[in-house]
C-alpha cells in the first residue's frame, strides 16, 4: 500500500466542522504551546459514517512538513523534484535536485496566496522533501529545509526578511535523515539546532537572524525539536540529541 509520502503528489486537505472553522490557530509543530493539546470545546468525538466534510483540497508536492494555521492562512513546505528519484536508501544518501517551497493558502477557501521557492539539492536518506513544519509568529513565518536552509518570511506576501544556511554558517554536515528539529520561537528568540562543536543549539534574534547565544557540543543535532517547559517556576529549554539531554536557560543558553 502506498503512503502519502511515496505517492508522486500528495494533497493538502482541510477537514472542518462549522465550529472548527472559527476555532483557535495551530501556528507551529504540536500547536500554540507545543504540547499537542487542542483547547477548543465542542469537538467531535467521532466522525460521521460518511466521513468528515472536506472544505477544500489542493495538491502539494513531496515532503513531510505538517501545516501551520494562523490568522486565516495555512502554511506548508514541499519539495518540487527536478532531477533524480527520492529513493528511501536507508543508511545511505541519495542525491536529487529540486526546489524547496514555502506555500501559503487562504484557510477558508484554499486559494494559494503566495509561494517562496529556492534551489535545494539533497544528499540524504529518505530525500522526499522538508521535514519541519513552519512556525508562525505574528506577521513572520519561519521555515527550515531538510539541508538546513532557514528562512524568515512575511506572512503577508512571502517576502524574504532574512535567511541563514545553517551548514555554511556553523560548518556542519546534514544529518543522514536531514534537519528535522522544528524551529521554536521563545520570546524574541528563534531556537534552532545546527549541531557541531558549541553550536548544538543556537538562539537567533527572530527579527534579524543575528546570533544571540550558542550552546552545547554534539556530533549531530539529532532529530528532536527544542521544547520549552516551566518547572519549579523556571522556564527551561530542553535540548535532546544523540549524546545527551540538557536543560538550558532560554535567554542565555547556559545549562540550568
Model-derived segments and spans:
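Intrinsic low-complexity, intrinsically disordered segments enriched in polar/basic residues
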Residues: 2, 14-15, 46, 161
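A subset of signal/propeptide-processing and intrinsically disordered low-complexity segments
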Residues: 4, 17-20, 244
Amino acid at each position: 500500500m502506498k503512503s502519502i509520502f511515496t505517492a508522486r503528489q500528495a494533497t493538502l486537505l482541510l477537514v472542518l466542522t462549522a465550529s472548527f472553522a472559527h476555532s483557535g490557530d495551530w501556528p507551529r509543530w504540536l500547536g500554540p504551546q507545543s504540547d499537542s493539546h487542542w483547547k477548543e470545546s465542542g469537538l467531535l468525538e467521532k466522525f460521521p459514517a460518511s466521513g468528515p466534510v472536506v472544505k477544500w483540497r489542493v495538491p502539494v508536492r513531496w515532503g513531510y512538513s505538517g501545516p501551520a494555521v494562523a490568522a486565516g492562512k495555512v502554511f506548508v513546505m514541499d519539495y518540487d523534484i527536478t532531477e533524480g528519484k527520492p529513493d528511501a536508501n536507508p543508511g545511505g544518501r541519495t542525491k536529487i535536485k529540486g526546489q524547496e517551497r514555502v506555500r501559503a493558502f487562504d484557510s477558508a477557501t484554499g486559494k494559494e496566496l503566495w509561494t517562496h521557492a529556492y534551489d535545494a539539492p539533497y544528499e540524504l536518506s529518505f530525500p522526499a522533501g522538508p521535514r519541519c513544519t513552519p512556525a508562525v509568529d505574528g506577521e513572520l513565518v519561519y521555515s527550515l529545509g531538510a539541508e538546513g536552509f532557514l528562512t524568515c518570511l512575511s506572512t503577508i506576501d512571502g517576502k524574504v526578511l532574512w535567511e541563514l544556511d545553517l551548514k555554511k554558517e556553523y560548518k556542519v554536515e546534514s544529518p543522514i535523515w536531514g534537519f528535522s528539529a522544528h524551529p521554536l520561537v521563545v520570546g524574541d528568540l528563534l531556537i534552532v539546532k545546527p549541531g557541531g562543536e558549541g553550536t548544538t543549539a543556537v538562539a537567533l534574534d527572530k527579527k534579524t537572524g543575528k546570533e544571540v547565544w550558542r550552546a552545547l557540543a554534539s556530533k549531530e543535532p539529532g532529530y528532536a525539536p527544542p521544547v520549552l517547559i516551566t518547572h519549579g517556576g523556571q522556564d527551561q529549554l530542553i535540548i535532546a540529541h544523540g549524546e545527551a539531554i540538557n536543560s538550558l536557560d532560554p535567554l542565555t543558553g547556559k545549562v540550568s
